[in-house]
Amino acid sequence: MSFFKGYVKTRDKRCAEKFKARTDFKTLEQVQSLDEYAGILANDAVLIDVDDGDQAELLMDIVEHLQLNCRVYQTTRGKHFLFKNNSGQIQKCFTHTNLGCGLTADIKVGLKNSYSILKFDGKERFIEWDIEPGHEYDELPKWLVPVRGSTEFLTMDAGSGRNQSLFNYILTLQSADFTVEEARETIRIINRFILKDPLDESELDVILRDEAFQKRSHGSRSSTSLDCL
């Protein structure tokens, strides 16, 4: 799979030529000598743009720990993470949106005529992470899709209501069509990588027990408490 269906000349990170409703894009060989160019995202590609340096490193830690088959470009402020979007679970672009895992990012999809700057100011962006030859890129993990509402997991520490916040977050994830297992995986990722002071495994098991999901599917955010389990 190629993440790009072609390339275009850019100027100050803006396209210097038309690219919508077009199929005759330049090849990589035709743009490599330029000081600046971009790749037009393929229809089955999605780009997670994390401009905050600290948050980009957190997401990179998750990618490395899970050994995800994706591509990661270093940018001037953060990182770009590219995945497949074959299932079409992301249908539009987002700006400064909350991801399921508790981070904030911009999202670009090839379905909406999006592009990614690959060379700027005479320097090609470094590919920090990529698949091995013969491997396939992964579909975008569910914990990277946008969710409504925000919980400041990044700033939480001991005594700030982490347990109840994670428990409440189950409803947010279920409202975004996360399955039970997808929600469990997401909350475990938040606990391990996003919280400054993670809960121990026994506390997490209480939050993620089966009864929590049964109650949340029939209750409301205001009426259900972790203490009720």
Please place each PLM-identified region on the residue numbering.
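Signature for HUH/AEP ssDNA processing cores
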Residues: 1-77, 84-87, 157-158, 178-184
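Positively charged, low-complexity intrinsically disordered regions
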Residues: 12, 126, 149, 163, ...
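Short secondary-structure junctions and interdomain/linker hinges
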Residues: 38-41, 147, 177-180, 194-197, ...
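DNA replication initiation modules
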Residues: 41-55, 60, 84-186
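Conserved short hydrophobic interaction patches
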Residues: 65, 174, 190-193
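Basic, alpha-helical nucleic-acid-binding regions used in initiation and control of genome expression
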Residues: 184-229
